Structures are given as structure tokens and as C-alpha cells.
Amino acid sequence: MSKVSQQNSTPGVNGISVIHTQAHASGLQQVPQLVPAGPGGGGKAVPPSKQSKKSSPMDRNSDEYRQRRERNNMAVKKSRLKSKQKAQDTLQRVNQLKEENERLEAKIKLLTKELSVLKDLFLEHAHNLADNVQPSSTENTTNPDKAGQ
């Protein structure tokens, strides 16, 4: 089986050429690959609006640079304060929930004790009722003297 392959190169956009490859022997067509057109021509395509901003580095002594740094520093400070406040709020909420949990656990203990006392009273009362209730027919049949009177 002989393998015949073909490569066609076509110029592309932004200095990138597209290579089309076909392999006739296997009957499959390979996916096109992107390669740089020339030396130093690789990399991502950058939109013109961002390209012009990044092309000239700012002078560290310029007013615009100082203003941008000041705005950035203020934004960072604000972000850090917000983060600290969020951490404090979370800690406060944790403490509140711990206190509430302790109160609820104490209430559970109290109610458990009360339930135990009430159960004991109920069982004692039920036992007393059972002891006080005796069949009257057994008294009459066991004592023949009272039965005839």
C-alpha cells in the first residue's frame, strides 16, 4: 500500500498561514493546522483597541501614571477593607450561632429533666391507681359472713 499525501499552504489572517493536509492512502482528511507565517509572527491576535494602549509603556513620572496608580491603590485598599469587614461579620455570626446553640442545648437539658420528672409522676400515679382498684367481688366471696347479711 503506497501512502500519498499532499500539503497546500495558503496565506491566512494576521500573518498566520494555514496548512491543509490530505492523506489519500487512508482515505481520511486531517484537520488544518495553524502555524506562524514567519519568524516572530506567532502569538495571539490582539484587537486594535487594546494593541494601541499596550504598545507604549507609561512614563512613571507622568501625571496619568500617578493618577492610575492612585486609583488602583484606592481600589486595592477598598477591596481589602471589604474583605476584612466580611471576615469580621462572619466571625460575629459564628459567635452568635455558638451562643444560640449553647442556649438551645441548656433548654434541651432542662426539658429532658422535666420530661423525666413528669414520666416518674405519671408512672407513680398509674401504679397507685392500679393498687387502689381491687375487684369487689373477691371480697364478697372470700368472706362468707358478709355475703349472707
From Swiss-Prot:
Residues 1-92, 128-149 are annotated as: Disordered. Residues 1-12, 131-149 have a biased composition (Polar residues). The keyword Electron transport does not apply. Keywords: Activator, DNA-binding, Isopeptide bond, Nucleus, Transcription, Transcription regulation, Ubl conjugation. Residues 62-125 form the bZIP domain. The keyword Transcription applies. GO terms for cellular component: nucleoplasm; RNA polymerase II transcription regulator complex. Transcription factor that binds to the promoter and the enhancer regions of target genes. Binds to the enhancer element PRE-I (positive regulatory element-I) of the IL-4 gene. Binds to the promoter and the enhancer of the immunoglobulin heavy chain. Binds to GPE1, a cis-acting element in the G-CSF gene promoter. PANTHER family: CCAAT/ENHANCER BINDING PROTEIN, CCAAT_ENHANCER-BINDING PROTEIN GAMMA. This is CCAAT/enhancer-binding protein gamma. The gene is CEBPG.
